[in-house]
Amino acid sequence: MPEGNKLFDTLSQLPLFNLLCGHDGLTCDFDWKHVFKRFRNTDLHKNSFSIDHVLITIEIIRGQLLSLGLSSTTANSLLSPNDKQDFVLMIKLLSSISSLPECDADERLTVIATCRVLHLLGRVYFYLLHAYLNIKLSLDEQLTYLSAAAHLILALYHSNKHDFIPVQFYFDVMSMIKNVYFCMAKTQIDNPVAQFWIILLGTDGLEKVFRKVQTMVGSDTNADQLQLANWIDGAVQCINILEEHPEWGADS
């Protein structure tokens, strides 16, 4: 980002913040719901992960969930969901891990090490979940929570590399957090008194457009570049109309 523009003046005040971006402050983004699912799937898909040379398996997580008072059936459903895209189960699992307490000092050293690692991972989930889902937080508190999550993820990845999460996933989650700060700064510059909701970021708007395109064209799914551009333009107009008149939609 070139020095001297308003966006640089705003974001350069943040120590260690990554100011690399495209033309005119363009940044990539990843949908927060998909990022959360990937945290869940990364933990479960590999059957184990390692932080600070402490191996965490699904059985260890199951034991910790049972210690919270969850039933065996509930713990199994959270760790072995029939639908890998089940958003509610994913939130429940990450929230449960974020609620794990610290171990008693008189426990065995291996148990203390395991609890410490899970408690640390739970802090990551806590900050991410509350930043996006706690409606009582102010924007300043949301940004503070995202910053805390980013610092923890950076430290964990620096120490553990792919034993913690894959490098591509690390890039994606850090890009998601970075984009929130960029979008906030752009809004602050364009309209200092405007309201800003980070939960509206992501790909929901794009997915809504493609769903509308699919509904409009039916089985005629093949298209050249010009046809697709026309379809998307029509879909966007329909979505804008329905946002102004929701009573005209299918649910009315």
Which residue ranges define each predicted feature?
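Non-catalytic regulatory appendages
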Residues: 1-252
